[in-house]
């Protein structure tokens, strides 16, 4: 019988301060007062094209100074936040269910970036002033209004300037679910997708129709105010949306339920009992009157053992296990969003990262423990797990389009955004400095082919074959201008299975996992892979030498799989005829060889075995 797995994540606890702003919590050591100036979409006196009146524009641009340097914040409304059939449910004091379908298209939740900073991001709530985060030049900043207006005083401060109560990361382990006997789980778990179909699934745009539930403690925590609760959840989901864009997944809110009278399930300090109770409620109650792909419970309870979130591994699309439970433990919406992103990752088949899993910047989302610094991206291991999940389970429910409120807005010339029907948009004529664009009409000047872009030079397309983005490593590819477009083509990588690092490894979704890189990650730049004799320890099946675990038992490696178990390394401090390995009582997977690592010619590690490239990476050799 295939048994789904529950994983709990333990994080640092930062208690809610009972305040509407971070500044009022008293945890900010230093901040700067700024006055954002909204850059008008159109100069005074110009006629704006007719469009439906909305309170919140589809695109906005603000300018202010941070540390004396000008910052231009470009914002675009997150039009993939809600499903068209979005509903809200709460309960009267006598327990009567009240369900409405409120208009949510004209909302105030935005994603964006800092102008002229390609690696910047921004997540902003613009309901009453600008409230949120932006990342620029590797620094994460918080902005929040001091008064309820987008043009009056705002506070800007570095995230790192916040006082931290407990910086020690906490860890936790996996819990086997031994009680499931559902036939649906068996059928889904035994499904296998061909490599060709799996690649098709990976490239397809995916949508998770998410149903959010706030328990009675959360409702009371926010002064028993439904509006405040919904704003909190919308803000959290706006962050979650941004995290999943890299996987081509849109997390779309299909419903919000607030247990305003009393909890509908048993919620207590046991995270496992709570999530099982929530899963049973979803199956027996929720799914009968509201379709959804996944449901997440936001609770005000403090789980035992500092657990902040829990979910079923690989439970997505399953009527019994497509759920998670998240503790609302922090004033910072981004930290709650990080936990929810992590738990959704488990539902999508992702396991906890080990020490050898790497990210380009900052902490990885699927680390078993998080500290005060929010994560930025999924690791190479998470990509592997997600690909394996798609290949073996297919998760059909996330492949349908949920009919989001993604309505194409009428183009407005002069707002600085190139929209449908425009050839360019350099802003109002009085500020436009682009020699290729007619600011008044948003059309290219005569004989101009382009106005901006990495492959645009002096108003003409750069020649085909000219470099516009250099390869970063062995598994990346140079991007070249096509001669037919101003934009640099999308980032492409060598095919999965392409040899890399002097034939030490094979490319996997743009990374090159090798034993050497993993040793260096664990032991420093002088570390090397240990002699083959050290890996023979993996045939012992003890705590320091095994290939995989089954029901808590260490399974020894078969001789052909020894390079896919515990990782053994050496460095200058290693004594002769000995080898080093990494072991942690708190994280059993720590120090194991990373999936996708080369273990022979045409072979890579997967599931504690040395298997063929075609099977492991979903490719045809």
From Swiss-Prot:
Annotated disulfide bonds: 317-397, 357-381, 359-364, 413-442, 424-437, 426-432, 436-459, 450-456, 455-481, 468-488, 475-507, 500-512, 519-569, 534-579, 547-557, 564-605, 599-610
Glycan-bearing residues: 225, 268, 319, 551
E.C. no: 3.4.24.-
Pro-peptide region(s): 21-188
Subcellular location: Secreted
InterPro entries: ADAM_Cys-rich (IPR006586), Disintegrin_CS (IPR018358), Disintegrin_dom (IPR001762), Disintegrin_dom_sf (IPR036436), MetalloPept_cat_dom_sf (IPR024079), Peptidase_M12B (IPR001590), Peptidase_M12B_N (IPR002870), Reprolysin_adamalysin (IPR034027)
Active site location: 343
GO biological process, alphabetically ordered: proteolysis; venom-mediated fibrinogenolysis in another organism; venom-mediated hemorrhage in another organism; venom-mediated suppression of platelet aggregation
Residues binding Zn(2+): 342, 346, 352
Single annotated GO MF: metal ion binding
Pfam families associated with the record: ADAM_CR, Disintegrin, Pep_M12B_propep, Reprolysin
PROSITE patterns in the cross-refs: ADAM_MEPRO (PS50215), DISINTEGRIN_1 (PS00427), DISINTEGRIN_2 (PS50214), ZINC_PROTEASE (PS00142)
Domain Disintegrin as annotated: residue spans: 410-496
Keyword terms, alphabetized: Cell adhesion impairing toxin, Disulfide bond, Fibrinogenolytic toxin, Glycoprotein, Hemostasis impairing toxin, Hydrolase, Metal-binding, Metalloprotease, Platelet aggregation inhibiting toxin, Protease, Secreted, Signal, Toxin, Zinc, Zymogen
Main location: secreted
Peptidase M12B domain segment(s): 206-402
Keyword Protease among UniProt keywords: yes
Signal peptide feature range: 1-20
Cofactor(s), names only, from the UniProt record: Zn(2+)
Tissue: Expressed by the venom gland.
Cofactor binding mode and count: Binds 1 zinc ion per subunit.
Motif (D/ECD-tripeptide): 474-476
Function noted in UniProt: Snake venom zinc metalloproteinase that inhibits platelet aggregation and degrades fibrinogen.
Family: Belongs to the venom metalloproteinase (M12B) family. P-III subfamily. P-IIIa sub-subfamily.
Subunit annotation: Monomer.
Protein name, as recorded: Zinc metalloproteinase-disintegrin-like NaMP
């Amino acid at each position: 019988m295939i048994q789904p797995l529950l994983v709990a994540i333990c994080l640092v606890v930062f208690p809610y301060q009972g305040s509407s702003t971070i500044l009022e919590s008293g945890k900010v050591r230093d901040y700067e007062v700024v006055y954002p100036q909204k850059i008008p979409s159109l100069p005074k006196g110009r006629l704006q094209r007719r469009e439906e009146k909305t309170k919140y524009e589809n695109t906005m641009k603000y300018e202010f100074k941070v540390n004396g340097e000008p910052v231009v914040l470009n914002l675009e409304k997150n039009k993939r936040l809600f499903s068209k059939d979005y509903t809200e449910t709460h309960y009267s004091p006598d327990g009567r269910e009240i369900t409405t379908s409120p208009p949510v298209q004209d909302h105030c939740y935005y994603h964006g970036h800092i102008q002229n900073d390609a690696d910047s991001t921004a997540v902003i709530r613009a309901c009453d002033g600008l409230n949120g985060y932006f990342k620029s030049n590797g620094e994460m900043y918080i902005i929040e209004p001091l008064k309820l207006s987008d043009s009056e005083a705002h506070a800007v401060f570095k995230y790192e300037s916040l006082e931290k109560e407990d910086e020690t990361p906490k860890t936790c382990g996996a819990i086997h679910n031994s009680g499931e006997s559902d036939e649906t789980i068996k059928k889904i778990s035994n499904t296998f997708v061909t490599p060709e179909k799996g690649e098709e699934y990976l490239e397809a745009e995916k949508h998770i129709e998410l149903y959010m539930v706030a328990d009675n403690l959360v409702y009371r925590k926010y002064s028993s105010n439904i509006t405040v609760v919904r704003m909190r959840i919308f803000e959290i989901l706006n962050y979650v949306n941004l995290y999943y864009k890299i996987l081509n997944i849109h997390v779309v809110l299909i419903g919000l339920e607030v247990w305003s009278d009393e909890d509908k399930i048993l919620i207590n300090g046991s995270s496992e009992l709570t999530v099982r109770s929530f899963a049973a409620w979803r199956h027996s109650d929720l799914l009968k009157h509201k379709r959804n792909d996944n449901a997440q419970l936001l609770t005000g309870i403090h789980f035992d053992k500092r657990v902040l979130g829990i979910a079923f591994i690989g439970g997505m699309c399953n009527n019994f296990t497509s759920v998670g439970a998240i503790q609302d433990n922090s004033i910072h919406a981004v930290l709650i969003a990080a936990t929810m992103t992590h738990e959704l990752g488990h539902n999508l088949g992702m396991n906890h990262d080990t020490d050898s899993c790497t990210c380009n910047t900052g902490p990885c989302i699927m680390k078993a423990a998080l500290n005060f610094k929010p994560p930025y991206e999924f690791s190479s291991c998470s990509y592997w797990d997600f690909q394996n999940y798609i290949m073996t389970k297919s998760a059909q429910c996330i492949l349908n389009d949920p009919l989001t409120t993604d309505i194409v807005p009428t183009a407005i010339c002069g707002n600085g955004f190139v929209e449908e029907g425009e050839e360019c948009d350099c802003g109002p004529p009085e500020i436009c400095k682009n020699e290729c664009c007619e600011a008044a009409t948003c059309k290219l000047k005569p004989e101009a082919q382009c106005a901006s872009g990495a492959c645009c030079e002096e108003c003409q397309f750069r020649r085909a074959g000219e470099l516009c983005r250099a390869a970063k490593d062995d598994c990346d590819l140079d991007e070249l201008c096509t001669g037919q477009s101003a934009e640099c083509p999308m980032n492409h990588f060598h095919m999965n299975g392409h040899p890399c690092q002097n034939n030490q490894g094979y490319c996997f979704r743009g990374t090159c996992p090798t034993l050497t890189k993993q040793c260096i990650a664990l032991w420093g730049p002088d570390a090397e892979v240990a002699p083959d004799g050290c890996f023979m320890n993996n045939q012992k099946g003890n705590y320091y030498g095994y290939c995989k675990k089954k029901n808590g038992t260490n399974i020894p490696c078969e001789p052909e799989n020894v390079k896919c178990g515990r990782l053994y390394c050496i460095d200058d401090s290693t004594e002769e005829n000995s080898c080093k390995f990494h072991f942690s009582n708190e994280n059993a997977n720590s120090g194991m060889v990373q999936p996708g690592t080369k273990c022979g010619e045409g072979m890579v590690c997967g599931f504690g075995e040395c298997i063929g490239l075609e099977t492991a990476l979903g490719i045809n050799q």
